[in-house]
């Protein structure tokens, strides 16, 4: 709980031993081209609503990094992400890995699919709500922040297959420059895969000022 609280803005609330999610995503094509992404989410509450706060997010595409930082306030950094659900191997496992820089592994994940749970449809989408903190500093040294606001958005999955299975996740602690391991795994790991999925980004209709 303390490790998560350190990363959360004061206006957000969390439960004891809050749920933490890790997402590896592979985008076959998008408005910024194909890329891969790693998203680290702390499940919390903001003004009584369940949301996910994103303290760490890595992406393999520079244009996507810039758009996410400037528009939604996500702390996107470039990273080397190895994740391909179509890559065959003799073990029947899906592997995922985040490195920054290349060769310095920060996160390793394994997924062993076991059961098809159903289809995602536009009529019954799966929605993951998230909250970014958009900060723009003052041009004047020591001056007040020009922008400091919470920006809500959501990933709305509208197609694809949902699979359950067994998961394994490890934070290596290899780098204090990208210290993802400071959010330790203290309970069991639940794993789900969205296969051949499509989603759309729900853009915000309003933002919320934050007095940092």
What are these regions (language model features)?
Residues 1-2, 18-22, 35, 60-61, ...:
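A short linear-motif detector with a strong N-terminal bias
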Residues 1-37, 170, 184, 196-198, ...:
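N-terminal domain-onset segments
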Residues 11-16, 55, 66-68, 171-173:
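N-terminal start-of-chain detector that recognizes signal peptides
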